[in-house]
């Protein structure tokens, strides 16, 4: 019995250490995926290809078929969240597509056993949260900037109360909102507001990016702390390998945006960013 108690003590200590180290890694930014920058015109979308059906490495397999079906189920709530935040629904969907493809291709067994049979989106609950993969610290900043008129990310008085909490435990309520497996509205709303805040800050600085899908998606991926308004920003972000083809987060988002996929639910509205 004494031996068993010792073993259990060691196991619990190891588990505790794992979560402490994990929190420290997130806080210090050590879990941020190394990014890349797209070279030349490798993934550039030509105007003649906008909205055209075309086979690409990311839309040929069962992963895309599953994702396509899962997103169709959420089309109404995605459009609702985008409207509330005032962003292009297809831009929001583009970021969702990339995050889910990244998850599907990196978590192969979970995809085969859960996501594919049930045709559902993957909901994260550890270092990143929800179907959009938002980091907890980013979610807190999104909330903070909504109420800070001095911030370049401030959207105005009418947006201030969109994320108000209804309980006294903000951390618990935030987590519950973002990791809800059955209702993804909060995940979409946080992400839509985040996109709006990024666009607003860049426009205020004199470098509007509303028409640049790839750059906006890149900023969504790399975070507030790396968002530095400037001329000629580059498309990049985390590198995602799909069927032996390397994409950056921003390039894949742009490629989806201008593709012929999911046009019925999310029509292309931005043609000036090419």
Regions found by a protein language model. Name each.
Residues 1-274:
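Cell-wall glycan-active module
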